[in-house]
C-alpha cells in the first residue's frame, strides 16, 4: 500500500526558485516521536537556521515513528531498530527532488542527534552512494550497550524454548560499526565526553571500526558536555555548518577563527 509521510520544508530567506539547492534531512526516527516541528521557536539551529546557509532542509516522519499515526505505523520498526526508517528518508528526498526543480537530488546531507545521530550514520553507511555528507551527534550507534529500557522495548527480544520447555531470550541489534566499510561520503561524528544518556562508547565503537576500515572521517569531541551541548552548542553549529558547506556546496573559505561567534 501507500503510506503518507508528513513533514516541513525550510528554505533560505532569500530563496530563489530558479536556483538549485543541496538538501539536508534533519532526522529522528522515533519510535516515540518524530522530529517534525508543528510551531516556530527561536531555537531552530538544526533546521531553519541551517537553511540560511544555502540549503533546503526538511524534516519528515517515517514508518515506525509517532504512535499517534496508528499501531501498525508505530510498530513498523519492531525487530529492526537500525534500518526501519532509512528507506523512507531516501525516498523522501527522491520524491521531493523529482517534484521541485530547486532541489539537487545529487547533493544530499543528513543530520540528527541521539536516535537521529544513530540514524544519520546508519543512512550514510547503508546508502553510501546516495547520502553525501552526514553530521551525527550523540548517537546510540550500538543499541546492545544502550539503555535496555529503550532498546529492548522498541526492538524486542527473540524468545526460544528448548525441548525441556526452558525459555531463553536472545538480544542482538544491528550496529552502525558493522557497516563501517561502506563509508564513501563525508561523516562528522560528534559527542560530549561525559554524555550520561548515550555513553560516548557508542561513538568510540564506530570510530574504531572506521579506523580499522581505513576510512577518512571527522570527529568533534565536546569536553564537559552531556547529552546536550549546552554552552558549546553555538560552536557545534558552526562546525556542522562548515561540514555541510564544504561537502555539499564546495564553499570552504573560513579562517581558523569562527568570527561569526563574536557577533552581537
Located regions from the model:
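Serine-hydrolase catalytic core recognition
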Residues: 1-264
Amino acid at each position: 500500500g501507500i503510506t503518507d509521510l508528513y513533514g516541513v520544508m525550510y528554505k533560505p530567506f532569500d530563496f530563489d526558485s530558479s536556483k538549485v539547492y543541496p538538501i539536508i534531512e534533519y532526522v529522528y526516527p522515533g519510535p516515540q516521536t518524530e522530529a517534525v516541528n508543528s510551531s516556530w521557536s527561536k531555537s531552530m539551529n538544526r533546521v531553519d537556521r541551517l537553511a540560511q546557509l544555502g540549503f533546503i532542509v526538511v524534516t519528515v516522519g517515517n514508518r515506525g515513528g509517532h504512535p499517534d499515526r496508528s499501531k501498525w505505523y508505530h510498530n513498523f520498526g519492531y525487530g529492526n531498530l537500525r534500518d526501519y526508517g532509512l528507506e523512507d528518508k531516501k525516498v523522501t528526498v527522491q520524491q521531493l527532488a523529482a517534484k521541485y526543480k530547486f532541489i539537487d537530488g545529487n547533493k544530499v546531507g543528513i543530520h540528527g542527534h541521539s536516535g537521529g545521530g544513530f540514524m544519520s550514520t546508519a543512512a550514510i553507511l547503508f546508502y553510501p552512494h546516495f547520502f553525501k555528507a552526514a553530521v551525527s551527534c550523540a548517537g546510540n550507534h550500538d543499541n546492545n550497550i544502550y539503555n535496555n529500557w529503550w532498546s529492548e522495548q522498541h526492538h524486542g527480544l527473540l524468545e526460544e524454548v528448548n525441548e525441556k520447555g526452558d525459555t531463553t531470550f536472545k538480544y542482538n541489534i544491528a550496529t552502525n560499526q558493522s557497516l563501517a566499510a561502506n563509508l564513501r561520503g563525508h561523516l562528522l561524528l560528534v559527542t560530549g565526553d561525559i554524555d550520561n544518556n548515550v555513553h560516548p562508547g557508542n561513538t568510540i565503537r564506530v570510530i574504531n571500526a572506521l579506523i580499522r576500515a581505513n576510512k577518512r572521517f571527522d570527529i568533534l569531541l565536546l569536553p564537559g558536555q552531556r547529552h546536550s551541548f549546552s554552552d558549546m552548542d553555538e560552536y557545534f553549529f558552526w562546525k556542522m555548518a562548515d561540514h555541510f558547506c564544504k561537502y555539499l556546496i564546495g564553499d570552504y573559505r573560513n579562517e581558523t577563527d569562527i568570527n561569526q561567534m563574536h557577533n552581537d
